[in-house]
Amino acid sequence: MHKDIATPIRTQEILKKYGFSFKKSLGQNFLIDPNILRNIVSHAKLTENSGAIEVGPGIGALTEHLARSAKKVVSFEIDQRLLPVLEDTLSPYNNVSIVHSDILKADVAKVIAEEMPGIEDIMVVANLPYYVTTPILMKLLNDRLPIRGFVVMMQKEVADRITAKPGTKEYGSLSIAIQYYVKADIAMTVPKTVFMPQPNVDSAVIRLIKHDEPPVKVINEDFLFVVTRASFVQRRKTIYNNLQAGLPNGKTQKDFILEALAAANIEPTRRGETLTIQEFGKLADALYPVFAK
């Protein structure tokens, strides 16, 4: 067994060898606790027939644990300076491919087809860059990739919002946007002390498992998300007031908004944070004829 990359001493050795300095703009925080990494991989439930997609491998700390568990690992790295480092640290593993690309611009489905032919169980497993966590998740969900789900590390505050239930202060349009596609829960919390350099916030690993069917069927998915975003324009305001302010030409359609709320059996005095995803689905369908133009 090779020495783990994710120890303080080994990480320092690698950084010194390559004269690597962290780029704050890329949100680079490397894990230095192999036990955390083993737990992350364990939550992904990978087998020798699984594939793993990683975003931001850094110096390969999580990548090597994935390589030990999965049939194939594909890691997307935006920072060109890390390519020779990864070539070195991951040289013992012949089942890893590094793709030098911004994940937000990558054709991930094409990469999966080319790099993982015949692999039916695929998970996204990553320590996500905190500054682009939400855009990465939404891109990968919207791309409808042939994956089972995600086990990903992120800022604890964002994890709380993603997994929030109706009626809580964390619940909002992000909760609905993610939970429309997946069942979401927090697998573990991670202290800031296990990173180099230490971030200012604690982290959490969340598990997102794709639904077989969405929790609500709607006329138009994009419009559902337009309605949910509008419903949280100002959290202290009622759903009725927020829809007027947040929907295009909402001020001129007050009566229709009231009719749509009644059709969806939603009191206009309620706040967006109290509505379930099923209620948002009914509301979006009721609003669709006038606002989806």
From Swiss-Prot:
The UniProt annotation places S-adenosyl-L-methionine binding at 29, 31, 56, 77, 102, 127
Write out the coiled-coil annotation as residue ranges. none
Subcellular localization, as worded in the UniProt entry? Cytoplasm
What are the EC numbers? 2.1.1.182
* Record-linked Pfam families: RrnaAD (PF00398)
In terms of InterPro entries, this protein maps to: KsgA/Erm, rRNA_Ade_diMease-like_C, rRNA_Ade_Mease_Trfase_CS, rRNA_Ade_methylase_Trfase_N, rRNA_adenine_dimethylase, SAM-dependent_MTases_sf
What keywords is this UniProt entry annotated with?
Answer: Cytoplasm, Methyltransferase, RNA-binding, rRNA processing, S-adenosyl-L-methionine, Transferase
What molecular function does GO assign, one term?
RNA binding
Q: What reaction does this enzyme carry out catalytically? A: adenosine(1518)/adenosine(1519) in 16S rRNA + 4 S-adenosyl-L-methionine = N(6)-dimethyladenosine(1518)/N(6)-dimethyladenosine(1519) in 16S rRNA + 4 S-adenosyl-L-homocysteine + 4 H(+)
What are the annotated GO cellular component locations? Answer: cytosol
What SMART domains is this protein classified in?
rADc
Where is this chain primarily localised? cytoplasm
What HAMAP family does the record tag this protein with? 16SrRNA_methyltr_A
Q: What does this protein do?
A: Specifically dimethylates two adjacent adenosines (A1518 and A1519) in the loop of a conserved hairpin near the 3'-end of 16S rRNA in the 30S particle. May play a critical role in biogenesis of 30S subunits.
Family the UniProt entry places it in? Belongs to the class I-like SAM-binding methyltransferase superfamily. rRNA adenine N(6)-methyltransferase family. RsmA subfamily.
Q: What is this protein called?
A: Ribosomal RNA small subunit methyltransferase A
Upper lineage is: Bacteria, Bacillati, Bacillota, Bacilli, Bacillales
- Which gene name belongs to this protein? rsmA
